[in-house]
Amino acid sequence: MQGLNHTSVSEFILVGFSAFPHLQLMLFLLFLLMYLFTLLGNLLIMATVWSERSLHMPMYLFLCALSITEILYTVAIIPRMLADLLSTQRSIAFLACASQMFFSFSFGFTHSFLLTVMGYDRYVAICHPLRYNVLMSLRGCTCRVGCSWAGGLVMGMVVTSAIFHLAFCGHKEIHHFFCHVPPLLKLACGDDVLVVAKGVGLVCITALLGCFLLILLSYAFIVAAILKIPSAEGRNKAFSTCASHLTVVVVHYGFASVIYLKPKGPQSPEGDTLMGITYTVLTPFLSPIIFSLRNKELKVAMKKTCFTKLFPQNC
């Protein structure tokens, strides 16, 4: 991130939830519990997949990669937010702000790319089951995970470089709880702010929409294949293998659409801050719950793993 323009401003101030002083302790406790649950839930999923040989398959390799991404995404944002809820000193250095934006966008886009890869995995499993082991080999799956991570890092670098090459002329208050693009654009000055804003918005929407359309295409083929299965039991079994992934996709893109496709007009900073909770705290919190409850195979394995750790003498 060399060449970033920080000659005018050396630090920013994260306003966060300062508009709700009487709620800050309650918000701290709530977000802390959700954060810990997110970490523990994803770590439990990873430990279960690692310890259960029956789960050593591409579907759960992608799930582990997704869990790692969610842990890193929340670590990039929530600890700083929790610290600010208990502090009156909310300044953040220029480079620290740039780093937070880079990591949050990188892991956020990696999450979207991995969901797309998981959609393709379900498509191959249901529409081409006889070719599954060939199309979803270990090498191929590792390559897809690596490409998802590389794509996320590139997106994070592109967005962060574009924003932090702008000039920030004196104003330092970011009306959000982390270094996000829209509130930072409001602090920027110069003739190129509008061009950068449109360019960054176009890149983000194109990437997210492209991932969503690919997932939609995968499920169009999946639904067509499921409808051809003669027995109701067979159709239910096929659909159950996709239920958890499909639910997470709906949650992920549902909240993303609220943020990126909201109508233009006057927006209160407090409203934008509260809306930011949906994709920084709520979505990562719900994801391990959905996967552990909607995926029967994973749920049974997680119960077995927990029972083994708690009562090893009975195993």
Swiss-Prot record:
What are the record's GO terms for cellular component?
A: plasma membrane
Which SUPFAM superfamilies does the entry link to? Answer: Family A G protein-coupled receptor-like
Q: Where are the transmembrane segments?
A: 26-46, 55-75, 100-120, 140-160, 198-218, 239-259, 273-293
Task: Give the Cytoplasmic membrane side ranges.
Answer: 47-54, 121-139, 219-238, 294-315
Localization, UniProt: Cell membrane
Q: What kind of membrane protein is this, topologically?
A: Multi-pass membrane protein
Write down the glycosylated positions: N5
Topological domain (Extracellular) residues are: 1-25, 76-99, 161-197, 260-272
Q: Which cysteines are disulphide-bonded?
A: C97-C189
**From what superkingdom does this record's organism come?**
Eukaryota
PROSITE patterns named in the record: G_PROTEIN_RECEP_F1_2
> Does Cell membrane count among this protein's keywords?
yes
InterPro entries from the entry? GPCR_Rhodpsn, GPCR_Rhodpsn_7TM, Olfact_rcpt
Q: Keywords in alphabetical order, please.
A: Cell membrane, Disulfide bond, G-protein coupled receptor, Glycoprotein, Membrane, Olfaction, Receptor, Sensory transduction, Transducer, Transmembrane, Transmembrane helix
Which is an annotated GO molecular function term of this record? G protein-coupled receptor activity
Q: Which Pfam families match?
A: 7tm_4 (PF13853)
Record GO biological process: detection of chemical stimulus involved in sensory perception of smell
PANTHER family, per this entry?
A: OLFACTORY RECEPTOR (PTHR26453)
The entry assigns this protein to a family as follows:
Belongs to the G-protein coupled receptor 1 family.
Q: What does this protein do?
A: Odorant receptor.
Question: Know the name of this protein?
Answer: Olfactory receptor 10H5
Species for this entry:
Homo sapiens (Human)
